[in-house]
Amino acid sequence: MVPLWWFIVLGVVLFVIGAAGVLLRRNILVVLMSLELLLNSVNINFIAFGHYYDDFRGQIFAIFVIAITAAEVAVALGILVALVRNKSTLKVDDVTMLKG
């Protein structure tokens, strides 16, 4: 059986990679994918802790996170399509002004 600390290390590594992608990259699509990596690393830890402590709440919470993430991706991709149509860019730096 795989020890719990392997899953914790995997989750931490994926979280650090995702956080670095969110903080360092300038492409909105890459930032969105890095955010998904962050959330999936948290899901790995929820499921691992739920399995090792014989509690199903970690799995249920991971399913809720996946559902909320799907809604977030749908909204973000809609905004991304509108942004590309209006500004013809995917760079975060080019989208700094908001008009009301």
UniProtKB/Swiss-Prot annotation:
GO biological process, one term: ATP synthesis coupled electron transport
Reactions that this protein is recorded to catalyse: a quinone + NADH + 5 H(+)(in) = a quinol + NAD(+) + 4 H(+)(out)
Keyword Transferase: no
Pfam families in the record: Oxidored_q2 (PF00420)
The keyword Ribosomal protein appears for this protein: no
Subunit structure: NDH-1 is composed of 14 different subunits. Subunits NuoA, H, J, K, L, M, N constitute the membrane sector of the complex.
Molecular function, one GO term: NADH:ubiquinone reductase (non-electrogenic) activity
Main location: membrane
Name of the molecule in the record: NADH-quinone oxidoreductase subunit K 2
Sorted UniProt keywords: Cell inner membrane, Cell membrane, Membrane, NAD, Quinone, Translocase, Transmembrane, Transmembrane helix, Transport, Ubiquinone
Function per UniProt: NDH-1 shuttles electrons from NADH, via FMN and iron-sulfur (Fe-S) centers, to quinones in the respiratory chain. The immediate electron acceptor for the enzyme in this species is believed to be ubiquinone. Couples the redox reaction to proton translocation (for every two electrons transferred, four hydrogen ions are translocated across the cytoplasmic membrane), and thus conserves the redox energy in a proton gradient.
Record membrane topology: Multi-pass membrane protein
Localization of this protein: Cell inner membrane
Family indicated by similarity: Belongs to the complex I subunit 4L family.
GO cellular component, one term: NADH dehydrogenase complex
Transmembrane segments: 4-24, 28-48, 60-80
EC number annotated for this UniProt entry: 7.1.1.-
